[in-house]
Amino acid sequence: MIAHSHGASGAPLLSRSVRRALDAMRANVSREWSLADLADVSGVSGRTLQRQFRSFLGKTPRAVLRDIRFELARRELQHGSPDLKVMDVAEGCGLTHFGRFSVEYRRRYGETPSQTRKRQVLFINALASTPAFFIAARDRLVVTLGAIEAGPENGEIARHVADELAIALMRAGVSVVTLPAAASCHLSGTIRGSGKQTRLTLRLIETATGRYLSAYRFDGPLDEHSAPREYLATRIAAALQPCLRLAEIESARRKPDIDLTPQDLALRAMPHVLSLDADGNARATDFLERAMNRDPDHALATALAAWAYGQRVVYHFSATPAEDRARSAELARKAAALAGDATALAVLGNAFTLLHDLDAAGRVIREALAVDGGSAWAWSRGGWIDVYNGDAESAIERFKIALDLAPNDPLAFNSLVGIGCAHFGAGNYGEAARWQQRALAEHPSATWIHRTMCPAYVLAGAKPEARRSVTALREQYPELTIAEVQQGFPPMPQGYRDLVFDALHAVGLPS
């Protein structure tokens, strides 16, 4: 099973013979394709096909077949039914030597096949066991969901998928309607093929302009033997969420200031809150104070403001941390009494963790997942709560679920930071530094990452990298001291905190 979410195709141009060979390999991945077999399918000589594969794909046909097998195995482990066995997946993909499969899988993806499978089972079980309830969308994006086109053999499946998708979108806070004239966006789809060759394709289009906003493709069986359709619909809704949210934000940006509603102001603030940097934070709080002045009971604006004021303390944006912490606490208590959707609840969970109130944070994150089990933000914040409670294994699972759900979300980098922090807590300092360096590469303005990345380098024995890291930290925060780091540090276990502060002292950060 293969699922993709994208806005524009980046697929390379291929010759007809290479495409034919690829189609043949994908249609029968378990077959031991020889070069002669592929040449017969492609209609060219083996030497020509070999040369074209190297020219277009940079690899031999055998290497490409192995890539296809591993990608298929990974997707089946990520999206298959709960009772799927790892060994059966490997054999079905033509990877018959299980020991070699496990070693190569870990080299490619940084985790074992069993870890991928465990995460999938955790997610499906969470969806099945959480009592779902709806919170009516307030001033949210309106989407019309058209019928999913399918042949007679897939007609019933198409109707079930459309029904589950409508429910998943509504749980995610999207207003789903049947009249196109009332909608900002139109979501349509098709189902083609059968069995393992089934393909579900969805397209999200802006109604006013006809512009394609996003697309989603799922390859794999959709019958009763596959994962529950509720699970697939939840994943689709989660993958579309960043694009839908961006469409809302762009709509708010296009409005004249005189026409802005509290929701519009909250949406304008959101990308600045998500930036997790000082400039963005200052712009966000301005928008959010305006929103709350117009509607003191606006749940999203209040939750975002609580988080934004908490960021000022934790990320050292503030000259008055005590005042900002008090303002964050006041707003968080107020937001907890308002009826927010899954997005507002996940944001509120962020605010409570920065206030070191892990019980309240855990409660609202559970509520967020009860509303929308596919909320990547809620899964990620659940991972942070596990980090703060010292449960590295559970934290990494939750962060990776968040990344599986919405790999292109603006907050995805913060899940990478979280994985790094979880590895640090487990004593895997080299891995901790590697994940946090990856996060910093994706979001260079978040220089506060050096606060925990530098100690990871110190404890991993990487002295040159540690010196470069602390230099970058002090360039951004020239007056920063260990006392200020202690004041703004998240609620990590005491042993974790001591390691960080001692390492920062060792590389020269003043007390």
Regions found by a protein language model. Name each.
Residues 1-60, 68-136:
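Alpha-helical bundle regulatory/interaction domains
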Residues 2, 79-81, 313-327, 485-490:
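Short, flexible, glycine-rich and Lys/Arg-enriched loop motifs at helix boundaries
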Residues 18, 229-233, 237, 497, ...:
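Short, amphipathic alpha-helical "lid/cap" segments that border enzyme active or binding sites
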Residues 57-58, 84-87, 413, 417, ...:
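Short beta-alpha connecting loops at secondary-structure transitions
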Residues 63:
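Short, basic-rich loop-to-helix N-cap that marks the start of a DNA-contacting helix
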Residues 130-438, 445, 450-457:
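Acidic, proline/glycine-rich low-complexity intrinsically disordered segments
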Residues 458-481:
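TPR/TPR-like (Sel1-like) alpha-helical repeat modules
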Residues 482-511:
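Terminal, low-structured helical/coil segments at or just beyond the last alpha-helical repeat
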